[in-house]
Amino acid sequence: MTMDPTKFRPSSSHDTTVTTTNAGAPVWNDNEALTVGPRGPILLEDYHLIEKVAHFARERIPERVVHARGASAKGFFECTHDVTSLTCADFLRAPGVRTPVIVRFSTVIHERGSPETIRDPRGFAVKFYTREGNWDLLGNNFPVFFIRDGIKFPDVIHAFKPNPRSHVQEYWRVFDFLSHLPESLHTFFFLFDDVGVPSDYRHMEGFGVNTYTFVSAAGKAQYVKFHWKPTCGVRCILTDEEAALVGGRNHSHATQDLYDSIAAGSFPEWTLYVQVMDPDTEEQYDFDPLDDTKTWPEDLLPLRPVGRLVLDRNVDNFFNENEQLAFGPGLVVPGIYYSDDKMLQCRVFAYADTQRYRLGPNYLMLPVNAPRCAHHNNHYDGAMNFMHRDEEVDYYPSRHAPLRQAAPPTPLPPRPVAGRREKATIRKPNDFKQPGERYRSWDADRQDRFVRRFADSLGHPKVSQELRSIWIDLLAKCDASLGMKIATRLNMKANM
């Protein structure tokens, strides 16, 4: 077998016609263990047996603490509109520029192998392999999230995860925790809405959720929100009965639909839009633009088309390109930066940290995560470091090595920051207006479906009357008629 002497990366393209050990020695019998006589005890010297069983016992890696259930596909992103006035990002430099991507869709709460018909947010993560490094855009199929401060992220996930005693998901825990956080209301108006269970991944919207920053070549910084719209339209499963039927027939229906569609040449496609806000104008709005529980009104901040995403190739190996695929919002490129969005700031650390736990400190060396452009730093050694290096200098600065600091394509605009060190909530929480507006935008049938789903969940026998009353009051603050409808369905009285 011919091996690459510099990269040391084994590949199935180098497969031999006979079985070997991991070290390359031929295996003459892969059917029987080495024993003393045909019935005798197994000998410890059967190295191949020990290696085979030991490797099998270690095939699984820790699953993601969230978004464990998912499916990936590969393709390209093509810039279709001139956005150079907004950002100096190289892959958006001109219409027609194509960038390779890999995309992972997922559910959030439950384990690998769980049904893909659960009422649960869906992840929509895109890795762009640009000429200036990888950019990861992580989002969901809802434009908002349950909380606005990352310090509560472990708590909200614990509340949605199965009960630690029974390992059964129970919504009384969700309602108990989030009754203390009315900011969560807006996301419930998506979760219990018709979009709560997408029919599959191809007919699903995506949203960046958090607020990012575009930086232009002139040094102008503007807030930006990202939106993915499927060109084939949005489809959802409207009833829990249909979801149970689809999920009962095939727990992997969305994964199979994605794979089969691409294999048949019916390539899923999305259009990327952005909303852009000048930070100098943020005070004119009745919400905080850095609050991820809020949407930006499209009549005031219209969607602007940027490009199209096409998935035209299935993964070659599910483990290598799905389980080992690692995303993190900390991966940005020149022209795209973070904002002071509290959830985003926390995610920048948390995602990289969870990948180091799942995959090891050198997870960005894995082929699916590695950049496609030349790169160089002094991050040496560590577990499973398989990068060939022959430099003598592993520090900076040095007169004996060519490594230099990169000159920024455009400096980040200076932004004075002043204030006291404090733990505090934002000034404009405004938690009830947008949920109420969303509810009133629906037709009567859609409102009724929302009421039924929400009330049925509140009707769980372990949800106390006190807790139901709290939620009825919260919903009534969004819309008085909604509070009345929920109360009526639960045979309770709304406190208006």
From Swiss-Prot:
The lineage of its organism: Eukaryota, Viridiplantae, Streptophyta, Embryophyta, Tracheophyta. SUPFAM superfamilies: Heme-dependent catalase-like. PROSITE patterns: CATALASE_1 (PS00437), CATALASE_2 (PS00438), CATALASE_3 (PS51402). GO terms for molecular function: catalase activity; heme binding; metal ion binding. Its cofactor is heme. Belongs to the catalase family. Coiled coil: none annotated. PANTHER family: CATALASE, CATALASE ISOZYME A. CDD domains: catalase_clade_1 (cd08154). Its EC number is 1.11.1.6. It catalyses: 2 H2O2 = O2 + 2 H2O. Homotetramer. Heme binds at residue 351. This is Catalase isozyme 3. It comes from Zea mays (Maize). The keyword Heme applies. Pfam families: Catalase, Catalase-rel. Leaf mesophyll cells, pericarp, seedling roots and the coleoptile. Occurs in almost all aerobically respiring organisms and serves to protect cells from the toxic effects of hydrogen peroxide. Its levels are highest in the light period and are lowest in the dark period, hence it may be important for scavenging hydrogen peroxide at night, rather than during the day. It comes from the Eukaryota. InterPro entries: Catalase (IPR018028), Catalase_AS (IPR024708), Catalase_clade1/3 (IPR024711), Catalase_core (IPR011614), Catalase_haem_BS (IPR002226), Catalase_immune_responsive (IPR010582), Catalase_sf (IPR020835). The gene is CAT3.
